[in-house]
Amino acid sequence: MAQETNQTPGPMLCSTGCGFYGNPRTNGMCSVCYKEHLQRQQNSGRMSPMGTASGSNSPTSDSASVQRADATLNNCEGAAGSTSEKSRNVPVAALPVTQQMTEMSISREDKITSPKTEVSEPVVTQPSPSVSQPSSSQSEEKAPELPKPKKNRCFMCRKKVGLTGFDCRCGNLFCGLHRYSDKHNCPYDYKAEAAAKIRKENPVVVAEKIQRI
């Protein structure tokens, strides 16, 4: 079989025009078209009067033709496998060249990027002391701030109120007797706040003036 595959010529298309590869042993046809051709010949032989006389020998001829078709199929597959192996072996030989090209490009990129990293190192280290100075100054400014003690006495009578005290809008804490604005002379202007709230909730809607032509 190996000698037969080596002696086969290059791939050729089927003579019937089906698009598959043909074989000179099958009259330039592919395996499928060759089987159809054999079946047509057998059918035409059966229809002839000569074929009726030799009806007993037809099964043997059919089996022989099928064996021949199988042998041609095996030959075609072997030829196709040899051509595919040759086509696969071609890019394998070209792999070392591509690897060398990639290694050369990687080495050039490393040489180009190496001086950039050396220049960027002092630039990063220089602003480090300037960044630390404002952080220390901010910590010094925040240090003197102390939490304000909670008010727990009435602003008027200085009575301990605790959690039962009343906060006024003027910002002071009062007991139950002095919580009203008229009891502790509250300086907060409630009228101005109410007027501003009314203006905000009820805006004045004015129609646009008609422009004369």
Curated annotation (Swiss-Prot):
Chain positions of all zinc fingers (AN1-type): 148-194
Chain sites annotated for binding Zn(2+) 1: 14, 18, 30, 33
Compositional bias annotation for Polar residues: 40-66
Residue ranges with Low complexity bias: 120-138
Annotated InterPro entries: AN1-like_Znf, AN1_A20_ZnFinger, Znf_A20, Znf_AN1
BP-aspect Gene Ontology terms: face development; fibroblast migration; in utero embryonic development; platelet-derived growth factor receptor signaling pathway; respiratory system process; skeletal system morphogenesis; smooth muscle tissue development; vasculature development
Compartment(s) where it occurs, according to its Swiss-Prot or TrEMBL record: Cytoplasm
Positions that bind Zn(2+) 3: 168, 170, 184, 186
SUPFAM superfamilies assigned to the protein according to its UniProt record, in alphabetical order: AN1-like Zinc finger, Glucocorticoid receptor-like (DNA-binding domain)
Keyword Metal-binding included in the entry's annotation: yes
Region (Disordered): 39-149
Modified residues (N6-acetyllysine): 209
Keywords on record: Acetylation, Cytoplasm, Metal-binding, Phosphoprotein, Ubl conjugation pathway, Zinc, Zinc-finger
GO cellular component: cytoplasm
Binding site for Zn(2+) 2: 154, 157, 175, 178
Molecular functions (GO terms): DNA binding; zinc ion binding
Composition bias, Basic and acidic residues: 139-148
Main localization category: cytoplasm
Mapped zinc finger ranges (A20-type): 8-42
Name of one Pfam family that matches: zf-A20
Modification sites for Phosphoserine: 48, 58
Subunit note: Homooligomer and/or heterooligomer. Interacts (via A20-type domain) with IKBKG and RIPK1 and with TRAF6 (via AN1-type domain). Interacts with ubiquitin and polyubiquitinated proteins. Identified in a heterotrimeric complex with ubiquitin and SQSTM1, where ZFAND5 and SQSTM1 both interact with the same ubiquitin molecule.
Free-text domain note: The A20-type zinc finger directly binds polyubiquitin chains and associates with the 26S proteasome. The zinc-finger A20-type domain is essential for inhibition of NF-kappa-B activation.
Function of the molecule: Involved in protein degradation via the ubiquitin-proteasome system. May act by anchoring ubiquitinated proteins to the proteasome. Plays a role in ubiquitin-mediated protein degradation during muscle atrophy. Plays a role in the regulation of NF-kappa-B activation and apoptosis. Inhibits NF-kappa-B activation triggered by overexpression of RIPK1 and TRAF6 but not of RELA. Also inhibits tumor necrosis factor (TNF), IL-1 and TLR4-induced NF-kappa-B activation in a dose-dependent manner. Overexpression sensitizes cells to TNF-induced apoptosis.
Protein name: AN1-type zinc finger protein 5
